[in-house]
C-alpha cells in the first residue's frame, strides 16, 4: 500500500476509514499498512536497512557492541548510511558514482520517481540483479543486468509485516541450474 505512487493518499484513506467506522483502539482492530516489498520486515530484522542495525537497533555504542558481540563481528558499521531517498539525492549531486540495485524497482516505488530515473543516468556504473529483463529501473539505463532467483526458486525464510516467519522452499529450479 505505502510503496506506490499513490501511497501518501492510500494510507490516510485507510486510517480515515478506520476512524469513520470506529475501528481504532479496540482489540483486533486498527489500520495495518502494507509495505511494497516482500520480506521487508525480514530485511529490517537482520540489519538490511542503512539507518538501523539488526533487530531494529540504533547506532548507540551499546547497541553497536551488542550486535558486534552477537555476530562475532569485530568490524561493524558505526553510523547510519543513507536512506533510499537520500541516496538518490546523493547520486543527483554526484556524490555516488556506482549503484547496484537488487530485486527492487526504485524508479517506480520511491517518491519523486522521475527524479530517481533522471539520477540513474548520472551513474558511472549501474548494475541490477533481478529476475526480470525489463522494468522501469532497468530501462533507465542499467549497464549490467545480472540474473537473480525468483521467490519460487529460493530456499530460506520470509518475515511478513506482522512478524510471522514462514519457511520458504523452492518449487522451481533456477534457470541455468
Write out the residue ranges for each language-model feature.
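Non-catalytic alpha/beta scaffold blocks inside enzyme catalytic domains
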Residues: 1-27, 32-177
